[in-house]
């Protein structure tokens, strides 16, 4: 059998990435050019800055990926690209590069949903069993997705306001922690105790919706009031208390989803899936079903996950024309509707 090589491009936010996947799940290379240092001084991602950085490095990422994989463009089978959701300017840079490369080398173009990429990153560890439940947690999304078969995604629950990663970054900013704050809050939480009481919105309700705005506001109010009164708060305990509330909500809703939807495994993916506290709670509390979490190198935004998702789309015959456009608000239920 002839080997299949898919080159994938990811540029939906602040990471420029090009990867090459061999056959079903062998990542030959996963080049990532991060912009985190450029955005730190702003306390978050600045869309215009992100787009400019993508333009500066994307050609080099293509060259480095082919060189590291020891392949020529003529060896490739297809090109995959994230077309949404994400920042429109950032998406357009990756799309333009992928379409130009596909056209120049007469290769089919595979459109990939960024969140499907996060979910399908779990494929690197082996074939997934369906139906499965997925908890997707990142800076822009918090979703429970029921996957009935490869490529068939159904959102069964999502946040009504802030995404969990967004909440981490906002409370981190209040505490004066550098962006992105998730990793540092996780580390500090392991050094503290759950001392301060924070609300756990809708945790006991049967539906699968999330809400983190109340928790975020309660945290900000506690911190502000303490400053006004000259009271000293213990940073480690603040982080431990905040993270305990977040994880209580995530675990409660995930358990409800598993009861409501027959599933053979649970996939937890997205940038927040790198959180050590979340991984520990999952291992402790969900023991009657296989829990699959991508390795740390595939939790953040990267083209490797886009390539892993592209295999499913390619095998279903989902290819796009060169008129494929960015869809910054793309949802799973609008997937394939180019």
Curated annotation (Swiss-Prot):
<feature type="binding site">
    <location>
        <position position="275"/>
    </location>
    <ligand>
        <name>substrate</name>
    </ligand>
</feature>
<keyword id="KW-0819">tRNA processing</keyword>
<dbReference type="InterPro" id="IPR043129">
    <property type="entry name" value="ATPase_NBD"/>
</dbReference>
<keyword id="KW-0408">Iron</keyword>
<comment type="function">
    <text>Required for the formation of a threonylcarbamoyl group on adenosine at position 37 (t(6)A37) in tRNAs that read codons beginning with adenine. Is involved in the transfer of the threonylcarbamoyl moiety of threonylcarbamoyl-AMP (TC-AMP) to the N6 group of A37, together with TsaE and TsaB. TsaD likely plays a direct catalytic role in this reaction.</text>
</comment>
<feature type="binding site">
    <location>
        <position position="118"/>
    </location>
    <ligand>
        <name>Fe cation</name>
    </ligand>
</feature>
<dbReference type="InterPro" id="IPR000905">
    <property type="entry name" value="Gcp-like_dom"/>
</dbReference>
<feature type="binding site">
    <location>
        <position position="186"/>
    </location>
    <ligand>
        <name>substrate</name>
    </ligand>
</feature>
<feature type="binding site">
    <location>
        <position position="114"/>
    </location>
    <ligand>
        <name>Fe cation</name>
    </ligand>
</feature>
<dbReference type="GO" id="GO:0002949">
    <property type="term" value="P:tRNA threonylcarbamoyladenosine modification"/>
</dbReference>
<dbReference type="GO" id="GO:0061711">
    <property type="term" value="F:N(6)-L-threonylcarbamoyladenine synthase activity"/>
</dbReference>
<keyword id="KW-0963">Cytoplasm</keyword>
<protein>
    <recommendedName>
        <fullName>tRNA N6-adenosine threonylcarbamoyltransferase</fullName>
        <ecNumber>2.3.1.234</ecNumber>
    </recommendedName>
</protein>
<feature type="binding site">
    <location>
        <begin position="136"/>
        <end position="140"/>
    </location>
    <ligand>
        <name>substrate</name>
    </ligand>
</feature>
<dbReference type="GO" id="GO:0005737">
    <property type="term" value="C:cytoplasm"/>
</dbReference>
<dbReference type="GO" id="GO:0005506">
    <property type="term" value="F:iron ion binding"/>
</dbReference>
<feature type="binding site">
    <location>
        <position position="169"/>
    </location>
    <ligand>
        <name>substrate</name>
    </ligand>
</feature>
<dbReference type="InterPro" id="IPR017861">
    <property type="entry name" value="KAE1/TsaD"/>
</dbReference>
<keyword id="KW-0808">Transferase</keyword>
<keyword id="KW-0012">Acyltransferase</keyword>
<comment type="similarity">
    <text>Belongs to the KAE1 / TsaD family.</text>
</comment>
<feature type="binding site">
    <location>
        <position position="301"/>
    </location>
    <ligand>
        <name>Fe cation</name>
    </ligand>
</feature>
<dbReference type="Pfam" id="PF00814">
    <property type="entry name" value="TsaD"/>
</dbReference>
<keyword id="KW-0479">Metal-binding</keyword>
<dbReference type="InterPro" id="IPR022450">
    <property type="entry name" value="TsaD"/>
</dbReference>
<feature type="binding site">
    <location>
        <position position="182"/>
    </location>
    <ligand>
        <name>substrate</name>
    </ligand>
</feature>
């Amino acid at each position: 059998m002839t080997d299949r090589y898919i080159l994938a491009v990811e540029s939906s936010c602040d990471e420029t990435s090009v990867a090459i996947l061999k056959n079903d799940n062998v990542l030959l290379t996963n080049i990532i050019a991060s912009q985190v240092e450029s955005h730190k001084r702003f306390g978050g991602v600045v869309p215009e800055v992100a787009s400019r950085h993508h333009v500066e490095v994307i050609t080099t990422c293509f060259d480095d990926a082919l060189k590291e994989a020891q392949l020529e463009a003529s060896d490739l089978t297809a090109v995959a690209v994230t077309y949404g959701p994400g920042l429109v300017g950032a998406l357009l840079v990756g799309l333009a590069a992928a379409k130009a490369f596909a056209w120049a080398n007469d290769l089919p173009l595979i459109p990939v949903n960024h969140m499907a990429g996060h979910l399908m990153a779990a494929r690197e560890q082996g074939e997934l069993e369906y139906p499965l439940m997925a908890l997707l947690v990142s800076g822009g999304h918090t979703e429970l997705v029921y996957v009935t078969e490869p490529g068939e995604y159904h959102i069964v629950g999502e946040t009504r306001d802030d995404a969990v990663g967004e909440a981490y970054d906002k409370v981190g900013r209040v505490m004066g922690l550098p962006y992105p704050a998730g990793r540092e809050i996780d580390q500090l939480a392991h050094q503290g105790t759950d001392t301060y009481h924070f609300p756990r919105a809708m945790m006991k309700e049967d539906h699968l919706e999330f809400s983190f705005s109340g928790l975020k506001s309660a945290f900000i109010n506690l911190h502000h009031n303490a400053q006004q009164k000259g009271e000293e708060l213990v940073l480690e305990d603040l982080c431990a208390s905040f993270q305990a509330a977040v994880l209580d909500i995530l675990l409660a809703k995930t358990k409800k989803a598993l009861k409501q939807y027959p599933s053979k495994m649970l996939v937890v993916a997205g940038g927040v899936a790198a959180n050590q506290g979340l991984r520990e709670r999952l291992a402790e509390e969900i023991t009657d079903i296989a829990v699959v979490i991508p390795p740390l190198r595939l939790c953040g935004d990267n083209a490797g996950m886009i390539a892993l998702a592209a295999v499913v789309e390619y095998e279903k015959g989902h290819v796009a024309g060169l008129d494929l456009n960015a869809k910054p608000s793309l949802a799973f239920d609008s997937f394939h509707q180019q």
